[in-house]
């Protein structure tokens, strides 16, 4: 894999989530991007079981268990303000056995799914973010394949993002700053998705200026 930028795109004014996704994919196809199947990233939140908390008033920690269709044999466990553990797919079974320590938060599952596009050295994924039956937002992931160091290719990623996102082009992800000259890996992408999902969970239903 290369270096990836994950961002949330606002819903276009007067349009639905699905209509905005169609606008974005149409722009990609006009650039010459070709469809390359589908993708899905999901996330379920677990919190520390009450029985494991010592003193009264002590707050529990959160853990996010995530899957990415690009890595079908792996499961990612991201601890709140902590490391990312990459395990095999049986990790979900282990979480059931650890229910005395971590409990699944009610109605916490959130996911994004959509279409993959290939454009030259860029892999683009435009997804609809859902919680339960409701569409909550739009995710865009862009990967630049030939490079594995974020600082070496951010300018190229930015230029490509601007070509179809315009004024909604995101800034450099926080994870880039933390790993300026380090080799980029799958865990860095999952951290970006975790941050995007948490942002969408917290968002209030207020109007925003979207894509035109």
UniProtKB/Swiss-Prot annotation:
Keyword DNA damage included in the entry's annotation: no
Annotated coiled-coil segments of the chain: none
Subcellular location: Nucleus
Signal peptide: none
Record keyword RNA-binding present: no
Origin superkingdom: Eukaryota
BP-aspect Gene Ontology terms: regulation of transcription by RNA polymerase II
Keywords assigned by UniProt, alphabetized: Activator, Nucleus, Transcription, Transcription regulation
Record function comment: Component of the Mediator complex, a coactivator involved in the regulated transcription of nearly all RNA polymerase II-dependent genes. Mediator functions as a bridge to convey information from gene-specific regulatory proteins to the basal RNA polymerase II transcription machinery. Mediator is recruited to promoters by direct interactions with regulatory proteins and serves as a scaffold for the assembly of a functional preinitiation complex with RNA polymerase II and the general transcription factors.
Known partners and oligomeric status: Component of the Mediator complex, which is composed of MED1, MED4, MED6, MED7, MED8, MED9, MED10, MED11, MED12, MED13, MED13L, MED14, MED15, MED16, MED17, MED18, MED19, MED20, MED21, MED22, MED23, MED24, MED25, MED26, MED27, MED29, MED30, MED31, CCNC, CDK8 and CDC2L6/CDK11. The MED12, MED13, CCNC and CDK8 subunits form a distinct module termed the CDK8 module. Mediator containing the CDK8 module is less active than Mediator lacking this module in supporting transcriptional activation.
Family classification: Belongs to the Mediator complex subunit 20 family.
Official protein name in the record: Mediator of RNA polymerase II transcription subunit 20
Organism per entry: Macaca fascicularis
């Amino acid at each position: 894999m290369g270096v990836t930028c994950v961002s949330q795109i606002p819903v276009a004014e007067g349009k639905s989530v699905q209509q905005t996704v169609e606008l974005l994919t149409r722009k990609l196809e006009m650039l010459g991007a070709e469809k390359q199947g589908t993708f899905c990233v999901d996330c379920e939140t677990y919190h520390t079981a009450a029985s494991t908390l010592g003193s009264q008033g002590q707050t529990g920690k959160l853990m996010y268990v995530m899957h990415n269709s690009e890595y079908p044999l792996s499961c990612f466990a991201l601890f709140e303000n902590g490391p990312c553990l990459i395990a095999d797919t049986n990790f979900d079974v282990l979480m059931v056995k650890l229910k005395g320590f971590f409990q699944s938060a009610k109605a916490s599952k959130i996911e994004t799914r959509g279409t993959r596009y290939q454009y030259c050295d860029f892999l683009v994924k435009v997804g609809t973010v859902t919680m339960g039956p409701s569409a909550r937002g739009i995710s865009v992931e862009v990967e630049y394949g030939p490079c594995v160091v974020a600082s070496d290719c951010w300018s190229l990623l930015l230029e490509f993002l601007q070509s179809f996102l315009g004024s909604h082009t995101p800034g450099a992800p926080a994870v880039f700053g933390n790993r300026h000259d380090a080799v980029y890996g799958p865990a860095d992408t999952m951290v970006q998705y975790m941050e995007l999902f948490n942002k969408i969970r917290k968002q209030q239903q207020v109007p925003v200026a979207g894509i035109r």
